[in-house]
Design a protein with these regions (language model features):
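Conserved helicase motor core of SF1/SF2 NTP-dependent helicases
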Residues: 1-118, 128-172
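Short, flexible loop segments at boundaries between secondary-structure elements
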Residues: 124
Length: 172
């Protein structure tokens, strides 16, 4: 059909894993031949500082416009205290399968059982849960792994255990 309109959407710089043998840029160039390339560089989730850092890493301009975005480093005690003051439906907590994520959740359930319990928390350590039939409720705090978090969003995101050594394990 000569009048068909094809739209290819994606950003190869945002991929986590590179397990394809396909050279995507080459394929798109051959498949589409004559096309318009649009760059989406405005990010509504990140601050300008984080967006600039990410843009440097990805070698492309990214404009962060979220002035409310804050990054803070905390120890477990500080995180427990911070989370105890939040509404469960605002929270997405991401971590490795065994580490500070589960320790923090255990403490929250023990010290703040009215706020953090089986009715208010969706917890999973499986890397494929976001593809399954079990879904977190809109009013639940979410405690899960990085790989299982695709498509999950909350007002507050807490990252656990994302160290250089953890990154090295993931990329190998």
């Amino acid at each position: 059909n000569p009048k068909i309109q094809i739209i290819a959407v994606g950003d190869m710089q945002q991929k986590i894993y590179d397990k394809t043998t396909l050279n995507v840029s080459e394929f798109i160039n051959k498949f589409l031949d004559d096309y318009v390339l649009l760059e989406f560089t405005r990010c509504f989730r990140l601050s300008s500082e984080l967006a600039a850092r990410l843009g440097r890493i990805w070698n492309k301009p990214i404009i962060g416009v979220n002035s409310e975005c804050r990054v803070e480093r905390m120890n477990i005690d500080q995180v427990v205290e911070f989370l105890a003051q939040q509404e469960p439906e605002d929270l997405l907590c991401l971590g490795s399968r065994n580490g500070d994520l589960s320790k923090t959740l255990n403490r929250l359930e023990e010290e703040y059982p009215v706020i953090y319990n089986k009715a208010t928390v969706y917890a999973s350590i499986s890397d494929s849960d976001s593809m399954g039939s079990t879904e977190p409720k809109k009013d639940s705090a979410i405690f899960t792994t990085y790989d299982s978090s695709k498509g999950l969003e909350r007002k507050i995101v807490v990252i656990f255990d994302y160290t250089e050594s953890y990154w090295s394990v993931r990329i190998n």
